[in-house]
Amino acid sequence: DQGNNVFDDYNLKLGMGDMGTLSFSGNSSSGSGVDKLKDIVPNAYTPVYEATDATDSGLIDTSGNNQSGQWGYDMSVGDLAISASYNPEPAENKTAESGFALVYSGLMDGLELSAGYFDDGDEAENDTLGVKYTMGAMTAAYQMTKVDYAATGSTDQDATHIGVSVAINDQLSVSAGQQSI
């Protein structure tokens, strides 16, 4: 590359109306599958896990969700949003990765229930459950995530995220959050 390190980022999305959206992710995040539920807890500026160190500990996709070459499919059926991802070859000599996310918003206005799962095809398996409620300018959410790493030397993580944000006006929001791992 003659010393020119270039980051090539490309995505392809095909909108199919009521049949949903099919996507392909080149070298960036796909936004499908568990990526939809990576962090549902509201924040005004920086999520709790970003303020402590460089590692995004306790998030559903931290154990190896490789988004390069990943296919995604998103659609809504009534009050249920469905998102799936599939990566046939995330890396050399690796088995296929798959994940999904479900968000149900039909119980009452402003309430969303979510569930997601990711499997790297080997040993890493992650799951998450969450609830999010929005009323006027206030949003509150609670999310539990379980991260099982494939590597034997890595410590698995059970994380709980909770937060609330209030939009004071169009230019100012205030939030508080906590993460326990």
Outline where the language-model segments fall:
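Outer-membrane beta-barrel proteins
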Residues: 1-181
